[in-house]
Amino acid sequence: MSKRRKHSWPQPLKGAESRLWYGGDYNPDQWPEEVWDDDIRLMKKAGVNLVSVGIFSWAKIEPEEGKYDFDWLDRAIDKLGKAGIAVDLASATASPPMWLTQAHPEVLWKDERGDTVWPGAREHWRPTSPVFREYALNLCRRMAEHYKGNPYVVAWHVSNEYGCHNRFDYSDDAMRAFQKWCKKRYKTIDAVNEAWGTAFWAQHMNDFSEIIPPRYIGDGNFMNPGKLLDYKRFSSDALKELYIAERDVLESITPGLPLTTNFMVSAGGSMLDYDDWGAEVDFVSNDHYFTPGEAHFDEVAYAASLMDGISRKEPWFQMEHSTSAVNWRPINYRAEPGSVVRDSLAQVAMGADAICYFQWRQSKAGAEKWHSSMVPHAGEDSQIFRDVCELGADLGRLSDEGLMGTKTVKSKVAVVFDYESQWATEYTANPTQQVDHWTEPLDWFRALADNGITADVVPVRSDWDSYEIAVLPCVYLLSEETSRRVREFVANGGKLFVTYYTGLSDENDHIWLGGYPGSIRDVVGVRVEEFAPMGNDMPGALDHLDLDNGTVAHDFADVITSTADTSTVLASYKAERWTGMNEVPAIVANGYGDGRTVYVGCRLGRQGLAKSLPAMLGSMGLSDLAGDGRVLRVERADAAAANHFEFVFNRTHEPVTVDVEGEAIAASLAHVDDGRATIDPTGVVVLRR
């Protein structure tokens, strides 16, 4: 991971005060110019002060090779700027025009079978194509030269959602780039052979030229897991290398103008190593779309907290989310009433100083015409636009009250997330396909919240070991360095929760031998010899295990065969004799150095974890940490605590009444009176303390 760039935030227009940014993607080229003035009128009404422009406008800006038309974009930016609306200007390189792909079909990426992915949607370019790079960098150069010194442009939006559709390319360009990547990482082909375990299945290589991408190998076969893991690393790096090239061209011509690109961080997405990418942007930005159903709010808060972790608690930018339904799910559920304000304020609570949507005006044609927007098809007279205006007013009040300059207050608890562990657990020849990394951190975040504890979600490379309490949930890969950090954290007094599927392999997906969890067995005080996966695909096979604490394990359990003398069993299995699991330990507490650990050797899910947490916390001497799980409380404060804010969200589907402190400065579906707040479902109250 490279050294992090110094954080730099888009500055207000000349003469304007620093405020929370608010707006969305704006596509004036998709509408007649007579609509633009009405757009600006509605933006002013809603409190919009920034829009992202030109993201998919390459074909409009360069309609023919070498011929540029900036006139329409100049007029749009000028109108916006004179109305006090700043512009986050795109490099416009996200989707190449047809003339380019017709002239150079070699820029199109290939799938694992070698088939060309043709134009017709977006992101049909291959990241490693030198031809595409030449054209993209030329456009960046033209954009930067034309808009250098423009008073209304406050940031660069480089490309868009790198890897959303072209994450994996299997072309010969990609093959050559992968060979170079391996040579840089491993230096010798023998080191590659060792890392990939090529002695298995006669895969030994004599030269870097023998390395090929993980192309199609036939149905029902298994790709080398080390190679597959490295290809995911390479693919993230290849896209990052292109981003850096675009960024550097823009920066060389417009120094001092902050640059970003929009990530896709959620509880269900790990396209790229966004923690690694976070080091290469001036400010971190994210596109997040809510998960319909009972996890909606918790997942929003979880993903926002992870963004705060990726940003290392510097202000970050919510670049895209939706006012209601998206267009790309089999069933595109509408958002619950009130969630426009609630979800956005959850992101603000977790450190976002900018709230933007896709998109400003809902399209009347194209693939995303059914994707909700700030101005829906129904127009100004609609509940969505009224909610958009309410949110704008709330963000304005928070700015007036001094929220800018505050950061999310550090929790006592860190839930650790690791992109590479997710990539490794996606492999199809693992002990079970019912378990991977990314589901467990969200379960822990929600279970902690059920016990009134708001955790920080942080990347494994971050300072998780500076917290009082840390959770390693299915962190499958533990390198020697991370294992050392674990050992030192607990020995020095840290409190650590570790789950099944943690520490099984090193960074090359080589198993830590001697019993699981490999490199930290002594820290957690257990030794696992075998696993007991569970499912319902085979009649009569083990499909669940009851615990004697009243919870139930599904999908996966460790067969813990021995525990340390320093350990205490907090829960065991109650199972029929034939299973071999009766009275086998399931949850084990241990002392190590000056610290304490709890090992959870099975998948309990959110509800099982929530029920087990009081006893687990008690074993660590942390019983007083729990609070009211009906609400999620998040605080923001500045370094001197002169400005201190508390956000209180209703997590339930019923009204809740709770004690609060301070002056209510924003409330949605909530009422505050004499230190008591009544908050309806999807409601939130913000207090200045």
Curated annotation (Swiss-Prot):
Listed GO MF terms: beta-galactosidase activity
GO annotation terms (biological process): galactose metabolic process
UniProtKB keywords: Glycosidase, Hydrolase
Location of the active site: 161, 320
Residues where substrate binds: 122, 160, 328, 368-371
Listed InterPro entries: Beta_galactosidase_C, Beta_galactosidase_Trimer, Class_I_gatase-like, Glyco_hydro_42, Glyco_hydro_42_N, Glyco_hydro_b, Glycoside_hydrolase_SF
Catalysed reactions, as listed in the record: Hydrolysis of terminal non-reducing beta-D-galactose residues in beta-D-galactosides
GO cellular component, one term: beta-galactosidase complex
Family: Belongs to the glycosyl hydrolase 42 family.
Protein name in the entry: Beta-galactosidase BbgII
Organism of derivation: Bifidobacterium bifidum (strain DSM 20082 / JCM 1254 / BCRC 11844 / KCTC 3440 / E319f (Variant a))
Highest classification ranks of the organism: Bacteria, Bacillati, Actinomycetota, Actinomycetes, Bifidobacteriales
